[in-house]
Amino acid sequence: MAEGETESPGPKKCGPYISSVTSQSVNLMIRGVVLFFIGVFLALVLNLLQIQRNVTLFPPDVIASIFSSAWWVPPCCGTASAVIGLLYPCIDRHLGEPHKFKREWSSVMRCVAVFVGINHASAKVDFDNNIQLSLTLAALSIGLWWTFDRSRSGFGLGVGIAFLATVVTQLLVYNGVYQYTSPDFLYVRSWLPCIFFAGGITMGNIGRQLAMYECKVIAEKSHQE
């Protein structure tokens, strides 16, 4: 009778949506898809904010922008977001430094809000010159890292992402793949690296939070075994 009772365990708790899948490869795919759509959504939202400065990659018409020549920009941002979001927890595991600072969704959402606020400031606040704009946004971006990350790997990846993304963007502009509508290209270059840095930190935090559920499932399974 005791054996019969042990063979019929109670209902298992599945937890969050990503925890209900036990395959690591499927978990990786789910996290990548989620990060991709988050990146696409943020790209569209931040582009709408930049319309105020007339430096957007899209035409002012929001509906027509989806079908414009720059339709590929949001998917590219989504792909980059997926890569960044998956890379951050992977680097943490390889370095043996699991990120434990402010690991909850409320902190992640505040990080997203601050990132959007930094982008909004670059579009709405008037600065005397481009140097003042660059220094202000750099301070805000580093403040975002210090408030929501504080990891050496996060800072290093953020700097690398900002440098690489800025170089790729400049190459695309110089080769005529697309161009900004603003005549003041120096203004665009003054805030671009800071936005990329803050975006890398933000997507890294989202990726870490999503990966945390997979770690919980693995720990629960090993404990049950």
Curated annotation (Swiss-Prot):
Function: Oxysterol-binding protein that mediates feedback control of cholesterol synthesis by controlling both endoplasmic reticulum to Golgi transport of SCAP and degradation of HMGCR. Acts as a negative regulator of cholesterol biosynthesis by mediating the retention of the SCAP-SREBP complex in the endoplasmic reticulum, thereby blocking the processing of sterol regulatory element-binding proteins (SREBPs) SREBF1/SREBP1 and SREBF2/SREBP2.
Glycyl cysteine thioester (Cys-Gly) (interchain with G-Cter in ubiquitin), cross-linked positions: C215
Known outcome of mutating F115A: Decreased binding to 25-hydroxycholesterol and subsequent interaction with SCAP
Cytoplasmic side: 1-28, 89-103, 149-153, 208-225
Subunit structure: Interacts with SCAP; interaction is direct and only takes place in the presence of sterols; it prevents interaction between SCAP and the coat protein complex II (COPII). Associates with the SCAP-SREBP complex (composed of SCAP and SREBF1/SREBP1 or SREBF2/SREBP2); association is mediated via its interaction with SCAP and only takes place in the presence of sterols. Interacts with RNF139. Interacts with RNF145.
Gene name of the record: INSIG2
Species this chain originates from: Homo sapiens
Swiss-Prot/TrEMBL site (Required for the recognition of 25-hydroxycholesterol) positions: F115
Signal peptide as annotated in the record: none
Domain-level remarks: Binds oxysterols in a pocket within their transmembrane domains and interacts with SCAP via transmembrane domains 3 and 4. The KxHxx motif mediates association with the coatomer complex.
Protein name: Insulin-induced gene 2 protein
GO molecular function terms attached to this record: oxysterol binding; protein sequestering activity
